[in-house]
Curated annotation (Swiss-Prot):
This is tRNA (uracil(54)-C(5))-methyltransferase. Contains a N-terminal TRAM-like domain, an iron-sulfur cluster in the central region and a C-terminal catalytic domain. The tRNA-binding site is probably formed at the interface of the three regions. Its EC number is 2.1.1.35. Activated by magnesium ions. [4Fe-4S] cluster binds at residues 61, 67, 70, 137. It comes from Pyrococcus abyssi (strain GE5 / Orsay). InterPro entries: MeTrfase_TrmA_AS, MeTrfase_TrmA_CS, NA-bd_OB-fold, RUMT_ARLMC_TRAM_dom, SAM-dependent_MTases_sf, U5_MeTrfase_fam. The active site is at 367 (nucleophile), 399 (proton acceptor). It is an enzyme of class 2 (transferase).
């Protein structure tokens, strides 16, 4: 089948007569040579480019097109932003400004590299058992090349058994690399099955080196902390606020855009008493407390709250963080409630409580525009201000921040 790609779907795939064409661009003339059915969708598994779209650029990553990490790296960045604006208009029904990421390479502060007999890298798109071998990850930056080189030497010299995904065998499974972009501190976490990890300090001189053991049957890139070398935490800094990073704690993955995110949230809040729901490690709450707001935060994750309390201490601010689920917390008496839920959106009980107890302002931070649109329809509030931030260049994902009154 021959034709011209006219549009992308919401996942960033080109569409040609009902067939999804990954890594294509609007304006590409292509020939589809093979089609497979994937989860009830027809996907071009093999196609040939006849004439290139003017929207195309040369991807910086050599693994682009096979690696499942980036899907839009072949599109110029201005068009990536336009694609996200169009996507938001379709979902929300109105135009939303998309703030560009300050950096579009070297912006990610975390990557989880699988370590297998076939290579070190990320899963091939659509193939959980297959790893694309890489030398570096351009969206993370130059530290990734250094870490991968040292890892290969570590494995070879110490004769370490690595992962066979299909057989679920092998000792060393993942290397998780994290970096404070504003502090230049680096952490590496080796995730293994039961066994003994040789001393990595002869090969790695990063600020913090961890060894974690995944004792579950799940394929996850974290586990029980066995031991660490160097610093217990690394730090990231957003403006004048420091945050501790631990292997088992979450932090916004684009530090450069996270600065714009916390600044925007601080612009939108009103009053003095702030409730920080889904607070995590206190990213918003501590930034606001540093600016004199009276902050109380809640999260259902006990370790996240432990980290939030540590962040309170190192920043010398006055803020409280407690463990509680979104179904339990009263929002009464707060001037502004910040909600930053997981992709599933707000729990229905929280929606009812917000409608009943009526805080003056809700600042809604969302990584899923579709659940955001659903929740806003259920809330007895209107959108006073909204902006999108491109936290995830080269992917179809986008972050929303809205003030509801």
């Amino acid at each position: 089948m021959r034709g011209v790609i006219r549009k992308l779907n919401d996942d960033g795939f080109g569409v040609l007569k009902g067939i999804l064409v990954p890594f294509s661009a609007p304006g590409d003339e292509i020939i589809v040579e093979r089609v497979e059915r994937v989860k009830k969708r027809r996907v071009a598994s093999q196609w040939k480019l006849v004439r290139s779209s003017p929207l195309r650029v040369g991807p910086r990553c050599k693994a682009f097109g096979k690696c499942g990490g980036c899907t839009l790296q072949h599109l110029n960045y201005d068009y990536q932003l336009e694609f996200k604006r169009k996507k938001l208009k379709r979902i929300l029904g109105f135009e939303v400004e998309v703030v560009p990421s300050p950096k579009i390479f070297g912006h990610r502060n975390r990557i989880d590299l699988a370590i297998t007999k076939d290579g070190i890298g990320f899963r091939e798109r659509g193939k959980w058992w297959k790893i694309v071998d890489i030398d570096e990850c351009p969206v993370f930056g130059k530290t990734s090349r250094e870490a991968i080189e040292r890892l290969k030497e570590f494995i070879e010299e110490e004769k370490i058994s690595v992962w066979n995904i299909k057989k679920d065998e092998g000792f060393l499974r993942y290397m998780v690399l994290r970096e404070g972009k504003f502090t230049e501190e680096v952490m590496v976490n080796f995730v293994t099955k039961e066994g003994n990890l040789p001393d990595p300090t002869n090969y790695f001189d990063f600020d913090s080196i961890y060894w974690s053991v995944n004792r579950s049957k799940s394929d996850v890139s974290y586990g029980d902390i066995e031991r660490f070398w160097g610093k217990e935490f690394i730090r990231e800094r957003l403006d004048d606020v420091d945050y501790l990073i631990h292997p088992n704690s979450f932090f916004q993955t684009n530090s450069y855009q996270a600065v714009n995110l916390v600044r925007k949230v601080s612009e939108l809040v009103e009053g003095e008493k702030i409730l920080d729901m889904y607070s995590g490690v206190g990213t918003f709450g501590i930034y606001l407390a540093k600016r004199g707001f009276n902050v109380k935060g809640f999260d259902s994750n006990e370790f996240a709250i432990e980290m939030a309390r540590r962040n309170v201490e190192i920043n010398n601010v006055d803020a409280e963080f407690e463990v509680a689920s979104d179904r339990e917390v009263s929002v009464k008496g707060f001037d502004t409630v910040i909600v930053d839920p997981p992709r599933a959106g707000l729990h229905p009980r929280l929606v009812k409580r917000l409608n009943r107890e009526k805080p003056g302002v809700i600042v809604y931070v969302s990584c899923n525009p579709e659940t955001f649109a659903r929740d806003v329809k259920m809330l007895d509030y209107r959108i006073d201000e909204i902006v999108a931030l491109d936290m995830f260049p080269h992917t179809p994902h986008v972050e929303l921040v809205a003030k509801l009154v």
